[in-house]
Design a protein with these regions (language model features):
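Short secondary-structure capping micro-motifs at structural edges
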Residues: 50, 71, 83, 107-108
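Charged, low-complexity, helix/coiled-coil-prone segments
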Residues: 32-46, 64-71, 173-181
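Short, low-complexity disordered segments enriched in Ser/Pro/Gly and basic
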Residues: 15, 76-80
Length: 197
């Protein structure tokens, strides 16, 4: 029997992948359009209350459901904090940022977590969506950052200006320099307020 666990334990049976997320909404059309725009997703099925979308070889990665009686999302309520999507490279993340900005969709919190360079957005229901790239080339390096002094001192990260990041990228500043974690830059004092809403 071959094991499929991340740590090589052949007795543990773990999922092979995260398949999809389903979001309930009372803003069906806005939500479908937003996720189609943000993820450049294709709709594989849609009727008046359900839409199934994908952006890769999976049959669907996200579904939007408008079941009767759904109320607005409670601000600061318990539950899922955000969904995160990883891009192939720095160039794709910057191109996505610029495409979304041109469509009037801007991040509420751009953060360099050290592990990842991330931009958090809010969908029409207020759910957070993180678009990110890894700041390291290997899983071992990423796991190593969890054990670093930088991470233990600040496990959230530091804010950055995405317009300035894009400007520097187009000016030819090396990607490694742009992804570099700079703990001295600090965290936006309003970060937790922005993220908790």
């Amino acid at each position: 029997m071959s094991g499929n666990s991340a740590n090589g334990d052949s007795k543990r049976i773990a999922p092979v992948k995260f398949a999809h997320a389903v979001l309930r909404t009372n803003k069906f059309r806005q939500m479908v359009d937003w996720y189609k725009t943000v993820l450049q997703a294709d709709v594989v099925f849609e009727n008046q209350m359900l839409a199934f979308m994908t952006y890769d070889d999976e049959h669907h990665r996200i579904a939007i459901a408008a079941f009767p009686g759904i109320e607005d999302r409670a601000p600061r309520g318990a539950g899922l904090d955000h969904l995160a999507y990883t891009y192939r490279n720095f160039s794709d993340l910057i191109a996505t940022y610029e495409r979304l900005k041109a469509a009037g969709i801007t991040p509420v919190a751009p953060i360099n977590h050290g592990l990842t360079l991330s931009m958090y957005y809010r969908d029409p229901d207020g759910n957070k969506v993180e678009l990110q790239i890894d700041n390291f080339d290997t899983v071992e390096e990423l796991k190593g950052f969890f054990r670093s002094n930088d991470f233990s001192k600040n496990p959230i990260g530091v804010t950055f200006d995405p317009d300035e990041l894009a400007r520097q990228y187009h000016a030819g500043v090396p990607e490694a320099e742009l992804r570099k974690y700079r703990p001295e830059n600090g965290l936006d004092p309003n970060f937790f307020h922005k993220m908790a809403q």
